[in-house]
Regions:
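Alpha-helical cap/lid subdomain in secreted, periplasmic
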Residues: 1-105
Length: 105
């Protein structure tokens, strides 16, 4: 559930900072292929929760979710997924790269 996800994410961020002092970048997931009937199709809620957590914990945030949707308006999901379900192919990984580069990496 979403509440468990956000609690676990907050715990991980706190622990990483306490134990390592490392910089933290949170990134959202991408939407699943809408043709996949067995997937979790509420990924937007998780993307928004991750963005909110980044604001609350003052972490960098890479918005893969909305960038993926913008590209998906011009390409089919199958063009970005290696298994046509939930694993990005090289183009899907390029989207992650582009979003992370905009964050400053």
């Amino acid at each position: 559930p979403l509440a468990t996800f956000t609690n676990n994410l907050a715990t991980m961020i706190d622990r990483i900072r306490e134990e390592t002092g490392a910089e933290i970048i949170l990134y959202s997931t991408f939407p699943p292929n809408p043709k996949w009937h067995y997937g979790s199709h509420n990924m937007e809620a998780y993307a928004m929760a991750t963005e909110q957590m980044a604001r609350e914990k003052q972490c960098a945030f890479a918005d893969v979710y909305h960038n993926w949707l913008a590209i998906e308006s011009k390409k089919k999901p199958e063009d970005m997924l290696s298994n046509n379900i939930n694993h990005p192919n090289d183009f899907g990984h390029w989207i992650y790269f582009e979003v992370l580069e905009r964050v400053g990496l």
